[in-house]
Amino acid sequence: MSIQAPPRLLELAGQSLLRDQALSISAMEELPRVLYLPLFREAFSRRHFQTLTVMVQAWPFTCLPLVSLMKTLHLEPLKALLEGLHMLLTQKDRPRRWKLQVLDLRDVDENFWARWPGAWALSCFPEAMSKRQTAEDCPRTGEHQPLKVFIDICLKEIPQDECLRYLFQWVYQRRGLVHLCCSKLVNYLTPIKYLRKSLKIIYINSIGELEIHNTCWPHLIRKLYCYLKEMKTLCKLVFSRCHHYTSDNELEGWLVTRFTSVFLRLEHLQLLKIKLITFFSGHLEQLIRCLQNPLENLELTCGNLLEEDLKCLSQFPSLGYLKHLNLSYVLLFRISLEPLGALLEKIAASLETLVLEGCQIHYSQLSAILPGLSCCSQLTTFYFGSNCMSIDALKDLLRHTSGLSKLSLETYPAPEESLNSLVRVNWEIFTPLRAELMCTLREFRQPKRIFIGPTPCPSCGSSPSEELELHLCC
């Protein structure tokens, strides 16, 4: 029979205070720092929102991570905290012990509240204070700095989530006193005009990740250019399923020039992902030329590129240290792959992931990329499915991966000899050919996770994954 541990004195003190809400409110100014976090948790769990309103006005730490106390943000506790902050921000003289600089509404470490009481208890002792002065104890001088509210925002629908709508209105009414800092902003189906309204409220220079889905390039560039060029701390930029919707070549050229000029200001960009790349077909050099920072991750997928577009990839230093390159479903069967081979040779020392899935590469083109591929000693993931390869070409490809000892996940297409007139796998022919390919590969190295054949498998429905070791469906 297990014996439940008795409550700690700190917990008992907090519970005692919360039994009398009026007493707990009056005691805030003199409440020891060590009691603040457990008392706040208790008040939160008991829905003592009036206590929360008062506690935030005397918060003795620089950060308050609210969302880590709950799975999702709820309106009532948010209103209680913002009401307390409103009363405080409008005062010229603020409480002596109030040190709050950041209200964090992101999904951060849920162990924060369990871990920190002890740390704060330690910091209350003079010996600890003499050894290290934390940011919480550093005096603030001069004018009051704006309160920073951190949040990750995903705009999916109209009307907006009630918490987000309330927060936007609250911040807008306190411009200059509050900065709404958004480390990640994702826009799915929300019209661009609503995204613009959000960007007028968000502190633009705080956005580290931006994703825009399901819009059209002309509209996006016209409406968002003035905001994009100010996102100077942007690290990740994703455009997914942004459509073309213009047949005017002159207008298209102007739009591309205007858009690519944005990248001259993005000095911290590390990831660029553009799904439906056709809009930049023939213009990719303009974009790559404007990149100011060496990228780690480049994804240009789904569409058509010209040979001149491929050539530019190996000509600029911004792509010289790529760790991840994804060109999946960019149709490459009509152009020379020598520029791609040159790029692979250039980034061989850094490349970890290479995705050439569905590019319809023909076996006659393969020799152009094999020397570069064989040099990619850091490669861990290689997707090459849905390309047109003969059994001999696949054997040659596998031989060129013999020195890639770090490969842990790899996919290859079924050889064309196993395909029928409808380009479907004839399993009676395919099964021995796959065994032959595996035998060839094992002469050089032992694969870890490998998938040879159509994806997903029409027989068992499996697709390449980290869990799949060897695809042996018959």
Curated annotation (Swiss-Prot):
Q: Which UniProt keywords apply?
A: Leucine-rich repeat, Repeat
Taxonomically, the superkingdom here is: Eukaryota
Q: Which PANTHER family match?
A: PRAME FAMILY MEMBER 2 (PTHR14224:SF98), SIMILAR TO PREFERENTIALLY EXPRESSED ANTIGEN IN MELANOMA-LIKE 3 (PTHR14224)
Q: Which GO terms describe its biological process?
A: negative regulation of apoptotic process; negative regulation of cell differentiation; negative regulation of DNA-templated transcription; positive regulation of cell population proliferation; proteasome-mediated ubiquitin-dependent protein catabolic process
- Repeat positions for LRR: 97-124, 179-203, 204-230, 231-265, 266-291, 292-323, 324-342, 348-375, 376-400
- Put simply, this protein is called PRAME family member 2
Q: Which organism is it from?
A: Homo sapiens (Human)
UniProt cross-references to InterPro entries, sorted A to Z: LRR_dom_sf, PRAME, PRAME_domain
Matching SUPFAM superfamilies? RNI-like
Q: GO molecular function of the protein, one example?
A: ubiquitin-like ligase-substrate adaptor activity
Q: Where is the signal peptide?
A: none
The family note in this entry says: Belongs to the PRAME family.
List, alphabetically, the GO terms of the cellular component aspect.
Cul2-RING ubiquitin ligase complex; cytoplasm
